[in-house]
From Swiss-Prot:
Protein name: PLAC8-like protein 1
PANTHER family in the cross-refs: DUF614 FAMILY PROTEIN-RELATED
Cysteine-cysteine disulfides: none
Family: Belongs to the cornifelin family.
Name of the gene encoding the protein in the UniProt record: Plac8l1
Length: 177
């Protein structure tokens, strides 16, 4: 077997379409993913600045923390950083783009529309306050389409919101009289 055939066959054993699970590419979202996707609305996340009030026992606060600002977390050609996204983005970019559209609550037919990748990239950049221009996005999407989809998928995977549950500890009563 040639060098290329040896490495390709080893890679195919590691990744199979049926056994791979992309966090952004799952046929049936679990209840947790549905809860998280509902919390990811188009409204920007707010920072919790108010501390729990004394005497409010049993109240629970859920805070979503979303990383925003800065540049893209990975470069356009850093495709091999995530093997699953690389696999889906380079062999079936439409499938990966469908998954990104599902992540944003769009129809799975979204990638069939002209300019859909451009809109998804701009939406991701604006939602996470990533620096860049429309001209840069246009050039990247039209010249490096599969790489652009992979970069957006990696960005969404790295910038997913983290949920924290904040519970107030019940106050201990003084038992000494």
């Amino acid at each position: 077997m040639s060098w290329m055939g040896h490495h390709f066959s080893r890679w195919c054993k590691d990744i199979s379409v049926l056994s791979s699970h992309l966090p952004l590419f799952s046929p049936m979202p679990s209840e947790d993913e549905h809860l998280i996707s509902n919390l990811r609305s188009h409204v920007p996340a707010r920072v919790v600045v108010k501390q729990p009030i004394r005497g409010a026992i049993g109240r629970t606060t859920v805070a979503a923390i979303v990383q925003t600002g800065g540049d893209w977390s990975t470069g356009l050609f850093s495709v091999c950083r995530d093997r699953k996204i690389c696999f889906w983005g380079l062999l079936c970019p439409m499938c990966l783009e469908c998954d990104i559209a599902r992540h944003y609550g769009e129809c799975l037919c979204w990638p069939l529309l002209p300019g859909s990748t451009f809109a998804l990239r701009i939406g991701t950049r604006e939602r996470h306050r990533i620096q860049g221009t429309l001209c840069e996005d246009c050039v990247v999407v039209h010249c490096c389409w599969p790489f652009s989809i992979c970069q957006v998928a990696r960005e969404l995977k790295m910038r997913t919101s983290q949920l924290y549950e904040i519970c107030e500890v019940p106050e201990l009563k003084n038992t000494l009289v």
